[in-house]
C-alpha cells in the first residue's frame, strides 16, 4: 500500500494511453510499461502508477483507490463521480482538441433532429448521460448499452441511432452515418480524490503534475527563435516579430548588435525566417520547446 507521502496516480488504458505516457515524458516523468502489467514504473519515488480504463477512472478516484488520475469529462459525467476537477488537459489520441459525443443516424434515414427519434432505440456506451439528455429534452427513447462497434448498430438494423464519440467525424461518415446533433464536448481532465486534495503533500504533488503537464501541452506547436540583429535594423525587426511576450533583447559584447530571442508558433517559421534574414538578422537559430510555464 502507498503511504501518506506517496501519490497514487491513475493512467488511462486504451485510446488515451500512448498520448498520456508521451505527455508525461515530455513533462519530465518517464512511465515504463511492462507486458500485461497494470502497475507501470515511473521515475519518481513519490508516485505509484496504476493502469485502468478511462471509463472506470473517476470511480476509483472518488473511492480513494487512486489519489488522482486522468480521464475524460464524459466519463466523470457518466459515472456522476464526486471528485475534484483539477484541470482540463486538452489532448487526445488524434489531436489536441476536444472530442464530441454526437447523435448519428443512417445517412439515408428520415431523422433530422433529436425530436424525430421519439420512441426509437439508441445504442451507446454512454448510457446514463444519454438517458439524462433525452429525458431532459422530454423525448422518450430506449437507450441500449453498446459493447463496441457502435457505428455498425444502425447499419445492421440493431438501433435507429447511436450516440458515439468522435474527434473528426471521419469514422462516423465512413460507416454511412450522418450526425444530426452534438450532445457533449469532452476532453481529458486531471481529477483528484477529495480527501487527497485536502492532504498538503498530495495536493502539492498534484499541483506540480498539473503545472508541468500544462506546460508541456502549451509548448506543443511553439518554437523558440534566436538571432543577432544590427541595432539600426531593430525597429523593422520588432515590427515583424510576433511573440507570447515581448522579445528578449540583449546587447552583444563590444558590438553594435543585439541578441533577440522570441517564442512563436511553429507554423509561421518557414515564412518568418526568410523575412527576418532579408531585414538583416543573422545567426538565426530555431529550437524546440518542451514546456512553457
Swiss-Prot record:
UniProt pathway: Amino-acid biosynthesis; L-histidine biosynthesis; L-histidine from 5-phospho-alpha-D-ribose 1-diphosphate: step 1/9
Listed Gene3D superfamilies: 3.30.70.120, Periplasmic binding protein-like II (3.40.190.10)
Subcellular location(s) per record: Cytoplasm
Coiled coil region boundaries: none
EC number of this enzyme: 2.4.2.17
Catalytic activity: 1-(5-phospho-beta-D-ribosyl)-ATP + diphosphate = 5-phospho-alpha-D-ribose 1-diphosphate + ATP
GO MF annotation: an example: ATP binding
Keyword Magnesium (UniProt): yes
Recorded superkingdom: Bacteria
Keyword Nucleotide-binding in record: yes
GO BP, sorted A to Z: L-histidine biosynthetic process
Regulation of activity: Feedback inhibited by histidine.
GO cellular component term, pick one: cytoplasm
Alphabetically ordered keywords of this record: Amino-acid biosynthesis, ATP-binding, Cytoplasm, Glycosyltransferase, Histidine biosynthesis, Magnesium, Metal-binding, Nucleotide-binding, Transferase
Pfam families, A to Z: HisG, HisG_C
InterPro entries, per database record: ATP-PRT_HisG_long, ATP_PRibTrfase_cat, ATP_PRibTrfase_CS, ATP_PRibTrfase_HisG, HisG_C, N-reg_PII-like_a/b, N-reg_PII/ATP_PRibTrfase_C
Cofactor(s) annotated in UniProt: Mg(2+)
Protein family (similarity comment): Belongs to the ATP phosphoribosyltransferase family. Long subfamily.
Record function comment: Catalyzes the condensation of ATP and 5-phosphoribose 1-diphosphate to form N'-(5'-phosphoribosyl)-ATP (PR-ATP). Has a crucial role in the pathway because the rate of histidine biosynthesis seems to be controlled primarily by regulation of HisG enzymatic activity.
Protein's name according to its UniProt entry: ATP phosphoribosyltransferase
Amino acid at each position: 500500500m502507498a503511504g501518506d507521502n506517496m501519490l497514487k496516480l491513475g493512467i488511462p488504458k486504451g485510446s488515451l494511453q500512448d498520448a498520456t505516457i508521451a505527455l508525461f515524458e515530455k513533462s519530465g516523468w518517464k512511465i515504463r510499461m511492462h507486458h500485461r502489467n497494470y502497475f507501470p514504473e515511473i521515475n519518481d519515488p513519490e508516485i505509484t502508477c496504476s493502469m485502468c480504463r478511462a471509463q472506470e477512472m473517476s470511480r476509483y478516484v472518488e473511492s480513494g483507490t487512486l489519489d488522482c488520475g486522468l480521464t475524460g469529462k464524459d466519463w466523470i459525467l457518466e459515472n456522476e463521480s464526486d471528485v475534484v476537477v483539477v484541470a482540463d488537459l486538452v489532448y487526445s489520441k488524434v489531436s489536441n482538441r476536444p472530442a464530441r459525443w454526437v447523435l448519428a443516424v443512417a445517412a439515408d434515414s428520415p431523422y433530422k433532429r433529436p425530436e424525430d427519434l421519439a420512441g426509437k432505440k439508441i445504442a451507446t456506451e454512454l448510457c446514463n448521460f444519454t438517458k439524462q439528455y433525452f429525458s431532459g429534452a422530454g423525448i422518450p427513447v430506449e437507450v441500449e448499452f453498446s459493447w463496441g462497434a457502435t457505428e455498425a448498430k444502425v447499419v445492421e438494423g440493431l438501433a435507429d441511432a447511436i450516440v458515439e464519440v468522435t474527434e473528426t467525424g471521419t469514422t462516423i461518415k465512413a460507416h454511412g452515418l450522418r450526425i444530426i446533433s452534438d450532445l457533449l464536448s469532452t476532453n481529458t481532465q486531471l481529477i483528484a480524490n477529495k480527501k487527497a486534495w485536502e492532504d498538503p503533500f498530495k495536493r502539492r504533488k498534484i499541483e506540480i503534475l498539473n503545472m508541468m503537464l500544462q506546460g508541456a501541452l502549451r509548448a506543443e506547436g511553439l518554437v523558440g527563435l534566436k538571432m543577432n540583429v544590427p541595432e539600426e535594423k531593430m525597429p523593422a525587426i520588432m515590427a515583424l516579430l510576433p511573440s507570447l511576450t515581448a522579445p528578449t533583447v540583449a546587447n552583444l559584447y563590444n558590438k553594435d548588435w543585439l541578441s533577440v530571442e522570441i517564442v512563436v508558433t511553429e507554423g509561421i517559421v518557414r515564412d518568418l525566417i526568410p523575412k527576418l534574414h532579408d531585414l538583416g538578422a543573422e545567426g538565426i537559430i530555431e529550437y524546440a520547446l518542451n514546456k512553457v510555464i
